[in-house]
Amino acid sequence: MSDVSTSVQSKFARLAKKKENITYMKREQLTETDKDIAPVLDLKCKDVSAIMNKFKVLMEIQDLMFEEMRETLKNDLKAVLGGKATIPEVKNSENSSSRTEFQQIINLALQKTGMVGKIEGENSKIGDDNENLTFKLEVNELSGKLDNTNEYNSNDGKKLPQGESRSYEVMGSMEETLCNIDDRDGNRNVHLEFTERESRKDGEDEFVKEMREERKFQKLKNKEEVLKASREEKVLMDEGAVLTLVADLSSATLDISKQWSNVFNILRENDFEPKFLCEVKLAFKCDGEIKTFSDLQSLRKFASQKSSVKELLKDVLPQKEEINQGGRKYGIQEKRDKTLIDSKHRAGEITSDGLSFLFLKEVKVAKPEEMKNLETQEEEFSELEELDEEASGMEDDEDTSGLEEEEEEPSGLEEEEEEEASGLEEDEASGLEEEEEQTSEQDSTFQGHTLVDAKHEVEITSDGMETTFIDSVEDSESEEEEEGKSSETGKVKTTSLTEKKASRRQKEIPFSYLVGDSGKKKLVKHQVVHKTQEEEETAVPTSQGTGTPCLTLCLASPSKSLEMSHDEHKKHSHTNLSISTGVTKLKKTEEKKHRTLHTEELTSKEADLTEETEENLRSSVINSIREIKEEIGNLKSSHSGVLEIENSVDDLSSRMDILEERIDSLEDQIEEFSKDTMQMTKQIISKERQRDIEERSRSCNIRLIGIPEKESYENRAEDIIKEIIDENFAELKKGSSLEIVSACRVPSKIDEKRLTPRHILVKFWNSSDKEKIIRASRERREITYQGTRIRLTADLSLDTLDARSKWSNVFKVLLEKGFNPRILYPAKMAFDFRGKTKVFLSIEEFRDYVLHMPTLRELLGNNIP
């Protein structure tokens, strides 16, 4: 216990020293930071003083500026109050005359109206850094626009046409405030309000007269400029230097632009600013917005909404044509009725409000998805046709012969079209004026031609070249459904159904036929004829397998075109009825032929090969089945092992649960032990404190052991100790006197059962006297009293005595071996070994040392505790 107390005391001392060192270091750091901060604070104070000086200078400059501004504003106010106010001119990019008119209105208003000035208050609040100076002048003109020339009535100079008693109000308000200005002398605020509202009934006459004179002067200037321009043009004409810049446009676009000419002139005269756009569109301004129109129909709709525009253009815009729509069979499309084969001379005119007369003809073509289906089905039927050559050879010969005749007809038409194109190129050499006259008076080169619509049986005849547009469409699906019916009724129904489907599914593709580009014209015609030839060649197979329309377009005479259309309907209806029944038979015959050929071609070698392959397949299948069975057996055998593993896992999980419970209990015990250890340490500390107190109280005491007791009790303890000192320590009396406080036997009561005499406890005045006696007793080794040997020791507590008693056996062995052992306070073993003193606090420490030292271990032998 004494060892633990010493270790605790040493730890406390170390901690105290560490705390002192830490506090000392912190104090030094604080002193250093104070030294570093001091110059920084000095610099900051200096910077602040410099900034304040600069700020004062700036404030003085600001005061000077404010004084100058105040003086200028005072001068301006005086000028305004004296009737010298000037109003800035208003800039207007559209009319230069508006500026002068506006200035005159304001001057007249200022002359006839009075001005009132109010100066209100002084000593207003003025801030340090804010300045708000406002100067407003507002002129509200309630008279409306003054730019139109027809604004005033020429017969009456006092009244206006739109408002008989229209008045003009001019309101000028000028406001000036000086606020938030730092002034040392005082605060001033000037607020000026200048308002002027007065009707202009008295001065209308003079004002209107002045406006009329100005407008007359402007008209004269405009006339002079026009005359100058005309004179310059005449001079240039005389000199032969007239230049005209015209866009290089085709004749069709020029003809279209002529339709807008009358409309253009009327709009230009009424200041609508019309323009021709590049896409042959008309644009003009209406209500401040630019309106664009691509055709007369859109313009007519807009005019119907605007009454003013409708009245202007009522003589120019054509009336709508009513279209009589019949039934489904005879209903002709609106665009096809209004198509125009337009050229430089506008041949074959048909009235149209749109721009469709730019195109030769609008042809309807199948969708791209349907064309792909046609191509795939054509490939399938081409294979069937090769097999069907023997059965239907005669029908194919007739069809090909008819197609060759039809191919020869467009070749002749191409020559006629080339001749017409050459004639049109010669006509293009004439000027624009001749073209306008020819379009209005002469007939075109295409007069006498016919536009034939075989689908709806409509013809447009002319005298020259005959053009026919034939749309032949067949639908095989509708024909296959009606195979059982009569041929005549079947033909009529199929043609009607195909015409209906074609009108729904086809797309419109316009072919431009501009007369100015003769090369393009030839190419377009050649492409059209070439397409007709290709489509006629593929007419029979496509009609057999698909229900999509396949169109043909050819140029021929009226009689030939009608015959061709009639023959084509017959051919297609005949082929549709014959091939549908023949295809199924051919398929069956082909399947039989292929089977027979396949069986005949198989030879013996091929049969052997097939047998070998079959055997190999069988063997491989059997092997795979065996392997699968083996794997299944292995799985079954391993199933028991899996079950055992599952059981073992269950056991392990149960054991784990038990272990967790035990660990929890052990943790609880450890917590309890930790609590017990805390209590034990507290008890040990308290005991150590008690022992220390007891040891200090016994520090001046000596025990005398072995002095016999007399029955008479004549000899007292004090006399006995004096005799012992005189007998054994006579030299100590010479140097100093040993003062004894008390001496008595312990315990105070006599125990008759006790065999040994009681100890005598002697207490000295000083602990130094006690130490002298103990040191002398160690040197003498033997102390006697009246010839008997006695023992003299220090007075110690029971705890220290118990701790020292543990060293008794070790002490004896070391004493016998000559190591000079001794027990130090409170219970330390010390002995000499190899010229050094070894000190041990506990027996465990001594045992560890002996085990590592073989010499000591040999000497001590079995006496090691």
From Swiss-Prot:
Coiled-coil zones: 642-684
Ranges of compositional bias, category Acidic residues: 376-440, 472-483
GO process annotations (BP): retrotransposition
Sorted UniProt keywords: Acetylation, Coiled coil, Phosphoprotein
PTM-bearing positions, type N-acetylserine: 2
InterPro entries recorded: L1_C, L1_dsRBD, L1_RRM_dom, Transposase_22
Pfam families on file: Tnp_22_dsRBD, Transposase_22
Region feature Disordered, mapped onto this chain: 370-508, 590-612
Keyword Zinc-finger: no
Descriptive protein name: LINE-1 type transposase domain-containing protein 1
Family per similarity comment: Belongs to the transposase 22 family.
Record PTM Phosphothreonine, positions in chain: 149
GO cellular component: intracellular membrane-bounded organelle; ribonucleoprotein complex
Top-level lineage group: Eukaryota
A GO molecular function held by the record: single-stranded RNA binding
Record field: compositional bias (Basic and acidic residues): 498-508, 590-608
Modified residues (Phosphoserine): 2, 154, 472, 476, 478, 518, 561, 573, 640, 648, 665
